[in-house]
Amino acid sequence: MTQVFQGRSFLAEKDFTRAELEYLIDFSAHLKDLKKRGVPHHYLEGKNIALLFEKTSTRTRAAFTTAAIDLGAHPEYLGANDIQLGKKESTEDTAKVLGRMFDGIEFRGFSQRMVEELAEFSGVPVWNGLTDEWHPTQMLADYLTVKENFGKLEGLTLVYCGDGRNNVANSLLVTGAILGVNVHIFSPKELFPEEEIVTLAEGYAKESGARILITEDADEAVKGADVLYTDVWVSMGEEDKFKERVELLQPYQVNMDLVQKAGNDKLIFLHCLPAFHDTNTVYGKDVAEKFGVKEMEVTDEVFRSKYARHFDQAENRMHTIKAVMAATLGNLFIPKV
């Protein structure tokens, strides 16, 4: 066995090399095939996995739970009311306790420093299910979905539309640069990515040959796009900025006019979900009443169109998370990459 992944944590995309990320994407596709064919793959038989959630989730919790069970492991959910991270007990102390009881830890919350402390002090692999800075497990699902549709990654162009400072935008930018994917951020100047994130991405882009573009010009942003990607306009914990964001981001909505500007009939649309594309939710109705906006980051027309791949993308969360857990905890033979 070669120790390529065994015992390693996945806290941000930059933790792994291009070859390692490509391997995990391909390994995910393999595990997806095994799942579809009903072939058992209990690589984590007898392992116990802690799922720590400061932030609520549908897809991340469901993906980690089903992935762990498919791998033969036992997942244990610990929500915000079950854990005392930094409140009544330090993150260091919590990590040391959990590391003696569990074989691996997933964390979804606010602070990147917290997930880093869990990895530093637990002594077991820790996987970032989302923080305010990064969303690495989402990226594997996103780029697996892209590869499934185009058969490759290098040289493609992905355009992210909306809040260029959020965790998904950060992760798309850096991961794309590592993998040789051209990444355009289509966003108002007020929400351009932080300079240090852009600098990091540009460094990777020089190695991979990818192009990075940050712009508020729609024509420049989407010309030749293969993938249009968007996310919610207001992230968890920023609800007080809703009115400001609705007004600021309305011109960056993914609608059919923007799709047509790309001039690519094979284009696909991605969204990490949940999406506010209609008023069929309490939240959507409330926004419509307060702000007169019935569709936010994406129109219902695009969301339900032939371009949409977001439900494939959501399913791929499970397969890619499974690959990360198996590779870092399963004592598998993985040729050096």
From Swiss-Prot:
* Pfam families noted in UniProt: OTCace, OTCace_N
In its keyword annotation, does this UniProt entry include Ion transport? no
* PANTHER family named among the record's database cross-references: ORNITHINE CARBAMOYLTRANSFERASE, CATABOLIC, ORNITHINE CARBAMOYLTRANSFERASE, MITOCHONDRIAL
Recorded GO molecular functions are:
amino acid binding; ornithine carbamoyltransferase activity
**What does the record give as its pathway?**
Amino-acid degradation; L-arginine degradation via ADI pathway; carbamoyl phosphate from L-arginine: step 2/2
Q: Belongs to which family?
A: Belongs to the aspartate/ornithine carbamoyltransferase superfamily. OTCase family.
Subcellular compartments: Cytoplasm
Instruction: Report residues binding L-ornithine.
Output: 167, 231, 235-236
Q: What class of enzyme is it?
A: transferase
Domain of life, source organism: Bacteria
Cellular-component GO terms for this entry? cytoplasm
Report the function annotation for this chain: Reversibly catalyzes the transfer of the carbamoyl group from carbamoyl phosphate (CP) to the N(epsilon) atom of ornithine (ORN) to produce L-citrulline.
Q: Which reaction does it catalyse?
A: carbamoyl phosphate + L-ornithine = L-citrulline + phosphate + H(+)
**Primary localisation category:** cytoplasm
A GO biological process held by the record: arginine biosynthetic process via ornithine
What is the organism field in this record? Streptococcus pyogenes serotype M6 (strain ATCC BAA-946 / MGAS10394)
Q: Which UniProt keywords apply?
A: Arginine metabolism, Cytoplasm, Transferase
* Positions bound to carbamoyl phosphate: 57-60, 84, 108, 135-138, 272-273, 317
* Protein name per Swiss-Prot or TrEMBL: Ornithine carbamoyltransferase, catabolic
What EC number(s) has UniProt assigned to this enzyme? 2.1.3.3
Q: Where are the transmembrane segments?
A: none
